[in-house]
Amino acid sequence: PFRTAILRGEPRSGKSLLGRWFAHAGLGETIDPADAMEETALFHRWNRAQEEGTALLLIPEKAPWEIALPDLRSRLGAALALEIGQPDDDMMRDLIVSHAARRGLMLGEDALTYVVPRMTRSFAAAERFVAVLDRLALERQARPTRNLCRDALETLYGPDQGRLL
């Protein structure tokens, strides 16, 4: 019955991007970060959205979202809960390829097959890995090979990470 959803996910998972798309497509209003908004103001915005028939997408920055105002807490408890989960191997691969392409890096299949199972499963980790890989490639004037990927993993996670598995 309520036209409100709460979208959660880890940092760098694309929550804000989805919220902008939602609003720009005219699907409703996005409040991001919703947990930074004063609770009484958010309560009134929620009520106004229901009265106007406007969909509302709330994106809290922190989890759990502690709500002190009882009326707001009960209303948000009835909202649709959406969550962007941790990326699986296929998503990690796609994230690495995407971040690398934006930096002009082309990773070969051998490098990707090596890196993906050794990575921490998070959107931010994929971004950090490619940033380190890009820096190492520039410093060494080298292509992003399997060996350079191993060095990037070791830079991020320590000297044994590149040898795991």
Indicate where each model-derived feature is located.
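Conserved AAA+ ATPase "SRH/arginine-finger" region at the nucleotide-binding site
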Residues: 79-91
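Short conserved motifs of the RecA-like P-loop NTPase core
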Residues: 106-119
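Conserved AAA+ ATPase "sensor/coupling" helix adjacent to the nucleotide-binding pocket
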Residues: 75, 79, 93-106
